[in-house]
């Protein structure tokens, strides 16, 4: 059984499309090639360097980045990203965030934008509890006020899958010939609510919870 619900869009890119899938019978994976790009991906090597990692959701050494072999996307894997509320949890457990700074080395003559992003995680929310996944991403020197919220409500025990898609006319490409960090900010929040505040609720994006990762899809363009 699959349920669909729209997320909440905030910031400058009001046209950003977003949807949420709750996967109750098993995870659903959005293939890397299903979003069209302006130009074909470059065939030469692409490297994604993690230049900075900050936040309570990704202690040092717990987040990895891998470029897919077909150069259509890159994968972010978190190993210890979980927010918890209720029971004996601490106030600092209710909200976890991870801020990644990536430097993506692309072949000369190419530039890229982020066309879409697929997020997956697991929710264990008691009755009355709520959860939230929030993300924004932007190039160094660009406005960072665009973010997307995906709320969840208990009772819920499921793998969730959310997707954000940027309209072609609103794609933001990295400047040609200039190295700019791509900053990715992701946040998880859980509120135990008042129905069963003593029951533990959680929302996670940990690879230890199954086939859990985040895929950022490139849109490629050749430079003049």
Task: For every predicted segment, state its role.
Residues 86-95, 104-113, 124-126:
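Short, solvent-exposed beta-strand/turn "edge" segments of beta-rich domains on protein surfaces
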Residues 80-82, 100, 104-108, 118-127, ...:
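Beta-strand elements of well-folded, non-transmembrane domains
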Residues 75-77, 157-201:
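Cysteine-clustered segments with highest specificity for TGF-beta superfamily mature ligands
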Residues 2-30:
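Secretory targeting and sorting signals
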Residues 190-224:
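Proprotein-processing/basic-patch segments
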Residues 69-72, 105-112, 126-128, 139-145, ...:
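A short, structured loop/turn motif at beta-sheet edges
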Residues 115-167:
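An exposed acidic His-Trp-rich patch
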Residues 31-87:
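N-terminal leader/pro-regions and domain N-caps
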């Amino acid at each position: 059984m699959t349920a669909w619900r729209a997320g909440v869009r905030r910031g400058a890119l009001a046209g950003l499309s977003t949807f949420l899938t709750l996967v109750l019978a098993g995870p659903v994976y959005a293939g890397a090639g299903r979003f069209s790009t302006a130009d074909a991906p470059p065939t030469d090597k692409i490297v994604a360097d993690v230049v900075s990692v900050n936040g309570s959701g990704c202690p040092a050494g717990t987040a990895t980045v891998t470029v897919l072999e077909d150069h259509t996307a890159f994968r972010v894997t978190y190993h210890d990203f979980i927010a918890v509320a209720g029971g004996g949890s601490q106030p600092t457990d209710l909200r976890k965030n991870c801020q990644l700074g990536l430097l993506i080395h692309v072949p000369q003559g190419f530039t890229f934008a982020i066309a879409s992003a697929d997020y997956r995680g697991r929710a264990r929310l008691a009755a009355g509890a709520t959860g939230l996944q929030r993300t924004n991403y932007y190039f160094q020197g660009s406005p960072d006020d665009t973010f997307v919220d995906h709320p969840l409500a208990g009772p819920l025990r499921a793998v969730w899958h959310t997707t954000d898609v940027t309209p072609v006319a609103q794609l933001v490409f990295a400047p040609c010939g200039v190295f700019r960090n791509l900053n990715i900010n992701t946040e998880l929040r859980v509120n135990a609510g008042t129905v069963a505040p003593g029951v533990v609720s959680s929302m996670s994006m940990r690879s230890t919870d199954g086939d859990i990762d985040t895929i950022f899809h490139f849109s490629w363009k050749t430079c003049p």
